[in-house]
């Protein structure tokens, strides 16, 4: 029903309509706020997704950067590493007459000289083409992986025998004619069967007469005649022994007769020399060397007089081992040492055993040098007391004289 504008109902109806109109924008505002909140929430979700995506992108970029750095480092290490291989693929096209151009860091191998094992790794000494021998380097097997053919050839050369070495061994082992006998490992000469067969050394009692004995036997008549001509007295027993033996080449000897038979002087002869005041050295008789076809041994030194003195006076009935003054023409060292041992082994030989006391002394000046001679009273091995000069003791019993001097030493400390 249509109503006018002034109708109260109409007015009343219009009022609620206006109120409806007024409520509509409020509802619209609430819906807009809801939509804005939803949009904001969506924007925040998108922002978070964007942030997460950006973070993921940053992580990916960092990983890419790290991977790039690692690749760059690996490339740098590959460039800096001393890999020395020969690669035909890396070589540039070769012009005729010019050496091949290799990639950077690669060098051409001329030959392999030696091989060694260092710290458990196999290494080869490489000779580089175009470089001197002083530039050779030891390279591990890993650096020569592309040169297996050269390494195989080198190993084959090592395994194959060298003919030059065999020739050298043959030369060193071939004995030279007329050379010295071969030696053992320690340098000792190898003895032949002939050198091993040596005659066993006979016992001392079975030894034949030595050179001095043979000379005395052959020249016995000359020696006796010479002594008689010089006015010396020869022991009767010696003359009788020589006459009894005759021309025999071997003299039967008792232990006392093992002394050298060149010259034997009696006690009377010694006393005669002492009475006349002549020294023993002036009355020495030289025995001429044996002549004939007899062997006297090789001379190992110059001939000279070997003097054996014993100034002690033997008693009566001492037999043939009395005091001796011997001068022998030395022909060989063997005869000398043998006679010396025999002389020392004589059981009846008399010697000084003790110096009792000094008796007198005499001073003399010779060539402006004062010399003192001391006479001692000494005890002999046969129990007799004799007078002995210090010179005789020095010649025959030096140790006994030194021992006596040491016993007589006196020490007076100065205050």
Swiss-Prot record:
The keyword ATP-binding does not apply. This is Probable chromo domain-containing protein LHP1. Residues 10-81 have a biased composition (Acidic residues). Homodimer. Residues 1-102, 158-209, 273-318 are annotated as: Disordered. One of its GO terms (cellular component) is heterochromatin. Residues 107-166, 348-412 form the Chromo domain. The chromo domain specifically binds to dimethylated H3 'Lys-9' while the chromo shadow domain is required for dimerization. Structural component of heterochromatin involved in gene repression. Recognizes and binds histone H3 tails methylated at 'Lys-9', leading to epigenetic repression. Residues 84-95 have a biased composition (Low complexity).
């Amino acid at each position: 029903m249509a109503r006018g504008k002034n109708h109260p109902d109409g007015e009343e109806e219009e009022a609620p309509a206006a109120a409806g109109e007024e409520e509509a924008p409020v509802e619209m505002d609430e819906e807009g706020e809801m939509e804005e909140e939803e949009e904001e929430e969506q924007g925040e979700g998108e922002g978070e997704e964007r942030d997460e995506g950006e973070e993921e992108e940053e992580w990916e970029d960092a990983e890419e950067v790290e991977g790039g750095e690692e690749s760059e480092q690996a490339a740098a290490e590959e460039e800096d590493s001393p890999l020395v291989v020969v690669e035909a693929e890396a070589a540039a096209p070769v012009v005729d007459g010019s050496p091949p151009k290799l990639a950077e860091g690669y060098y051409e191998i001329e030959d392999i000289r030696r091989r060694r094992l260092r710290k458990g790794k196999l290494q080869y000494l490489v000779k580089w083409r175009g470089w001197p021998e002083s530039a050779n380097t030891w390279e591990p097997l890993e650096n020569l992986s592309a040169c297996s053919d050269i390494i195989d050839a080198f190993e084959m050369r090592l395994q194959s025998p060298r003919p030059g070495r065999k020739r050298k061994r043959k030369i060193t082992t071939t004995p030279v004619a007329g050379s010295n006998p071969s030696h053992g490992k320690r340098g000792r000469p190898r003895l032949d069967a002939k050198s091993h067969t040596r005659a066993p050394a006979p016992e001392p009692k079975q030894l034949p007469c030595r050179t001095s004995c043979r000379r005395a036997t052959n020249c016995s008549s000359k020696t006796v005649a010479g002594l008689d001509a010089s006015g010396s007295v020869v022991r009767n027993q010696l003359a009788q022994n020589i006459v009894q033996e005759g021309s025999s080449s071997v003299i039967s000897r008792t232990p006392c007769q093992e002394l050298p038979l060149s010259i034997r002087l009696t006690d009377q002869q010694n006393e005669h020399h002492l009475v006349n005041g002549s020294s023993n050295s002036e009355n020495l008789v030289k025995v001429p060397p044996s002549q004939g076809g007899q062997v006297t041994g090789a001379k190992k030194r110059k001939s000279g007089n070997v003097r054996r003195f014993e100034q002690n006076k033997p008693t009566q009935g001492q037999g043939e081992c009395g005091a001796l003054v011997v001068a022998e023409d030395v022909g060989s060292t063997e005869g000398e040492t043998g006679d010396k041992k025999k002389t020392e082994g004589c059981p009846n030989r008399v010697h000084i055993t003790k110096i009792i006391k000094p008796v007198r002394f005499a001073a003399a000046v010779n060539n402006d040098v004062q010399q003192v001679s001391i006479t001692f009273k000494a005890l002999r091995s046969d129990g007799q007391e004799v007078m002995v000069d210090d010179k005789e003791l020095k010649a025959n019993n030096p140790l006994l004289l030194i021992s006596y001097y040491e016993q007589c030493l006196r020490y007076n400390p100065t205050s």
